[in-house]
From Swiss-Prot:
One Gene Ontology term of the molecular function aspect: transmembrane transporter activity
UniProt xrefs under Gene3D superfamilies: MFS general substrate transporter like domains, Multidrug resistance protein D
Organism from which the protein derives: Mycobacterium tuberculosis (strain ATCC 25618 / H37Rv)
Gene Ontology biological process terms in this record: response to antibiotic
Subcellular location(s) per record: Cell membrane
Function, in words: Contributes to spectinomycin and tetracycline resistance.
Record's protein name: Multidrug resistance protein Stp
Length: 537
């Protein structure tokens, strides 16, 4: 490994480290962000969902543009946009600016994630050096995701929530300097054309759906605004499918979904990310707003999830090679559902059960991600493997975005339906009760301003804080049950339709690909996990 190769590896690894760090670091800062801007559950959902939404809508087009215009160029664009977005997040004077800046971060992260590994692959043409470099690159990125919640908690406790964004500035500047000075350009002369119409329709469909799901509990599911957004999403999706089926250079090749194994693998991976990222959002809020933990302690409490993913992931590839993909997928889904059920029934008990539940969730995720990728990539022709991999990347981001939106909205809807009637046991005055319920729901905090709204002498029988905490716990339980139910549906479908004869480990997929393609091990958007990404040589 010469000096240029080493610095290329550092530049690409640090870029990926930044975007993976921000995938989870924001969660522990949400209560502080809420207090700064006085926003409700929907505002917090937008803060976390806008990042993954930006990635979801742009990741496939970013790969095409990078192949056409140069991967180094788009890596620089991605890092620059991500860094500028971080500055805007840190300086944000309102929740609207913060949400917009998070979306810009997501767009930059999409460009970084699809170009980083390609630049490493081009810098190390020799097979053994390439494998070693990718191992180091993967480790650097994994550190970002496994340490994100813990580092975020420490930063928030010491310097406030804005510091979690400012920490990206020196790293971004270093990555830009190293990339400009040492990273060589590469591109793909056979890349397909950029599908602008498909990209715009994809943004409209996904964006309208996420907006309707997040805002529905606040503005009403039958309101004109919600109905218009749902119809916009439906029409946008229909037009997108119609256009992509007729395009000679589609952004998303929908004919791949004719294969049952591939379609089921995509549905499974989307559902896993839906459940896990929604769970992480709700668990973080529970630990801080109900248990009263500080951000740093909350970050440490989340660590078993990330650690389990990091520990189990490297072992799964060998397991798939020996026993096939079907058993690890189904076992991983079972373990993930068991972890969610443990979280559902652990709120009133010891923190140890929460830690065990998070560890089971992490182990289940790690156990099923690699074999799902194996099933998907062995189900498609070799010449379409790049497109198949790109669709998987987009569906991961879409799953996490919808998870934030749906599970957060389930909690908000539960509180809207139950909190005010339950508060009648403690606050008999209907005006005070209504105002208190609205403030608790809007602040997403069961302890919010109780003393300032209801004087102690007006409280009867029950403590309103205790009632609100019980409703929050029940709302989180309902949301996690929704996540568990979606996983159960996918499990039953997998039991019926996942193939029984897929024994090809991710590292062996190169045997079935033409020499024009190289198969590399990339880090997914899940902490510590690895998956297969295919790059044109």
């Amino acid at each position: 490994m010469n000096r240029t190769q080493l610095l290329t590896l550092i530049a690409t690894g640090l870029g990926l480290f930044m975007i993976f760090l921000d995938a989870l670091i924001v969660n522990v800062a949400l209560p502080d962000i809420q207090r700064s801007f006085a926003v409700g559950e929907d505002g917090l959902q937008w803060v976390v969902a806008s990042y993954s939404l930006g990635m979801a809508v742009f990741i496939m087009s970013a790969a095409t543009l990078a192949d056409l215009d140069g991967r180094r160029r788009w890596y620089l664009i991605g890092v620059s946009l991500f860094t500028l977005g971080s500055i805007a997040c840190g300086l944000a004077p309102s929740i609207a600016v913060l949400t917009t800046a998070r979306g810009a971060q997501g767009l930059g992260a999409a460009a970084v994630s699809v170009t980083s590994l390609a630049l490493v692959s081009a810098a190390f043409p020799e097979a053994k050096e390439k494998a070693r470099a990718i191992g180091i690159w993967t480790a650097i990125a994994s550190i970002g995701t496994t340490t994100g919640p813990t580092l975020g908690g420490l930063l928030v406790d010491q310097w406030g929530w804005r510091s979690i964004f400012y920490v990206n500035l020196p790293m971004g500047a270093l990555v830009l300097f190293l990339t400009l000075c040492y990273v060589e350009e590469s591109c793909n002369e056979r890349a397909r054309r950029f599908d602008l119409s498909g990209q715009l329709l994809f943004i409209v469909a996904v964006g309208a759906l996420v907006y309707a799901v997040i805002e529905g509990p606040q503005i009403g599911w039958t309101s004109v605004q919600t109905i218009v957004m749902l119809w916009t999403a439906a029409v946008g999706c229909a037009l997108f499918v119609w256009l992509e089926r007729r395009s000679s250079n589609p952004m998303m090749d929908l004919t791949l979904f004719r294969d049952t194994s591939y379609a089921l693998a995509i549905a499974t991976i989307c559902t896993v990310f839906f459940a896990v990222y929604g769970m992480l959002l709700l668990t973080t809020q529970f630990l801080q707003n109900v248990r009263g933990y500080t951000p740093s302690v909350t970050g440490l409490m989340i660590l078993p999830f990330s650690a389990a993913v990091a520990i189990v992931s490297p072992l799964v590839g060998h397991l798939v090679g020996r026993i096939g993909a079907r058993v690890p997928i189904l076992a991983g889904l079972c373990m993930l559902m068991l972890g969610l059920l443990m979280l559902i029934f652990s709120e009133h008990r010891s923190s140890a059960l929460v830690l065990v539940g998070l560890g089971l969730c992490g182990s289940g995720v790690a156990l099923c991600l690699t074999p799902i990728t194996t099933v998907a990539m062995t189900a498609v022709p070799a010449e379409r493997a790049g497109m198949a991999s790109g669709i998987m990347s987009a569906q991961r981001a879409i799953g996490s975005t919808i998870g934030f939106a749906v599970l957060g909205s389930v909690l908000a809807a539960w509180l809207s339906a139950t909190l005010e009637p339950h508060l009648e046991r403690a606050v008999p005055d209907p005006v005070q009760r209504h105002v208190l319920a609205e403030i608790i729901i809007d602040s997403a905090n069961p302890r919010a301003h109780v003393g300032g709204i209801v004087p102690r002498r007006h409280i009867e029988h029950r403590d309103p804080v205790a009632i609100a905490e019980e409703d929050f716990i029940e709302g989180i339980r309902v949301a996690l049950l929704v996540a568990t139910a979606t996983l159960a549906v996918v499990f039953l479908a997998g039991w019926r339709w996942f193939p029984r004869d897929v024994h090809t480990a991710g590292s062996d997929l190169s045997e079935r690909l033409p020499t024009a393609m190289t198969v590399e091990c990339a880090v997914s958007h899940m902490p510590g996990a690895t998956w297969c990404r295919l790059w044109p040589a």
